[in-house]
Amino acid sequence: MSHSQTSHNPRLQAALAHARHGRAVLPVYWSIGGRCACGRADCPSPAKHPIPDLAPRGVKHATTSRVVIRAWWAHAPLANPALATGEASGVVVLDVDGDHAGFTSLRELEHIHGDIPHTQKVRTGSGQHLYFAYPGTHLKNTAGKLGPGLTPRQ
């Protein structure tokens, strides 16, 4: 893939934007016709797991290196950029499931605790990610404890 082709790739541009902000990324598989591009018919995490040929150690291979990121997307231009959360990038992500449960839980939290602070929001294939500053300490596993359809990622 030529430089001009990669420079117009929105997935590459998203990965580079994260890197510019000090957030380490890695390439993960994408979806083809509703199935994971990894080719496994029974893939347990479609379009959400690292590409082993590019990042064999998964999130431990996440980087902010523009050279590495460009090489990854030259090899796999359809790859989705995944963010290494927690201390590696200084962010915690709240994964809001796109079904009614996730957004209902989010509204209930806002009703109890007030509006969620202004933050970066990214639409995902099945909902939304909200980005918050990493608090400096590892949070205990809170999956499902904030409400149905809400999962913090760090």
Where are these regions (language model features)?
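Conserved phosphate/metal-binding and DNA-contacting active-site motifs used
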Residues: M1-Q154
